[in-house]
Amino acid sequence: MRQGKAGIVIKRLVIMHAAALGVIPVTCFANETIGSGGSGLVSHPIGYMSIAVFLLAYILVAAEEFTHLRKSKPVIIAAGIIWGLVAWASAHSGNGHAVEEAARHNLLEYAELMLFLLVAMTYINAMEERRVFDALRSWLVCRRFGFRALFWMTGTLAFLISPIADNLTTALLMCAVVLAVGGSNSRFVSVACVNIVVGANAGGAFSPFGDITTLMVWQKGVLGFWAFFSLFIPALVNYLVPAAILHFAVPDEYPECRAEKISMKPGARRIIGLFLLTIITAVSFHNFLGLPPVIGMLTGLGYLQFFGYLLKRADQRLLKGGNTADSDAGRVGDVVPFDVFSRVARAEWDTLLFFYGVVMCVGGLGYIGYLALASEVMYSQWGATTANIVVGLLSSIVDNIPVMFAVLTMNPDMSTGQWLLVTLTAGVGGSLLSIGSAAGV
């Protein structure tokens, strides 16, 4: 209740601050000196307005659960306002071209990450449509495991699956297993779901594909593909220690089997194989050819498109043959609905657009010079280790995407070990609070 009142007070203060700035005639801003790169805007009223706009947008993002306003909407508008203010002020000082170049640079970074994530999401949706995850859930439910065994199995699977899929998909899958098994046992469900979130976040921290933050670090070229795997032991410890503590809260009982056996649809195993081949292609393009990983991922999308085409052709021949045997009829019904573009359409577009807003907002604030100031305080005065630990703590309060993108934009001069540390803390820091990660939410 106190948190809710505090949020309302903060929101009102930000609105009042923005309104106060808004009544100042903007024409009096433009004639002030603006340094190259936007650094002169740090103490400029337009800089303050940009901060206020970003804070207001992020308050709306944090209140998504209560307002039911999609998180992408406020940050997209905030990004447009911030860059519009910066461009307007810079145009009057002759720096318009520099602003355009900076905006294009941030947009290119977003485009690479968005296309990469889009391919990964398409494959995950295709595997979901082929009932890969349902089959795994069905197998786990009816194996007569006890609650404690299921607690460790679901948590361990979350840790192992999230590096290949992503922590949100993994958490949804494993929590569905827990709900199917635990049902009315709320104690087991709550403890097991916490364990899954911790496992998924920890597992995603040691793989470039496990979380958006690790993908950002890899795409930026700060760490090589294989460097992430040196985080395996620290990530494992981050999972095992909380799991060992939670183990004693799990009831020592056995659930009832209430689920029917579910089989994967035809083509499911080949789609899994194509996804692994796509990952290999992306890594090979980056490591051996020096190309952006997104080109390899989009090539992998072509693999899936061709396979979908062949799958449809095979089913059309089966339908034209008029074979209505029960076994074939089930197969036809399973295969015909598959369509690659419908899988693309079902991607997490709100997340992708939210990511656009965050990248552009943070990029705009970075152009103004606020990130340089933050970098000076955090990495020059506090030291890299302290700063990177603080990044992890911030990730539990604020979404780890803007926090990590801000660090990457600051681009502090750090050793590989420190970059690995901030990658780990940003990934697992979200486990401290339920709102700290997409999996937790």
Pin down the residues of each PLM region:
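Juxtamembrane and boundary regions of transmembrane helices in multi-pass small-molecule transporters
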Residues: 186-190, 194, 202, 206-207, ...
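Structural signature of hydrophobic alpha-helical transmembrane segments
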Residues: 40-53, 108-119, 162-171, 231-242, ...
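N-terminal secretory/membrane targeting signals
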Residues: 1-31
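Interfacial loop-to-helix junctions that mark the boundaries of transmembrane helices
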Residues: 36-47, 67-72, 97-111, 225-234, ...
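Transmembrane helical segments that form the transport core of multi-pass membrane transport proteins
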Residues: 100, 130-133, 137, 150, ...
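Hydrophobic mid-bilayer segments of alpha-helices in multi-pass membrane transport proteins
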Residues: 48-58, 68-93, 110-122, 173, ...
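Hydrophobic alpha-helical transmembrane segments
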Residues: 51, 76-77, 114, 148-156, ...
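Membrane-interfacial helix-loop connectors
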Residues: 34, 82-91, 95, 107-108, ...
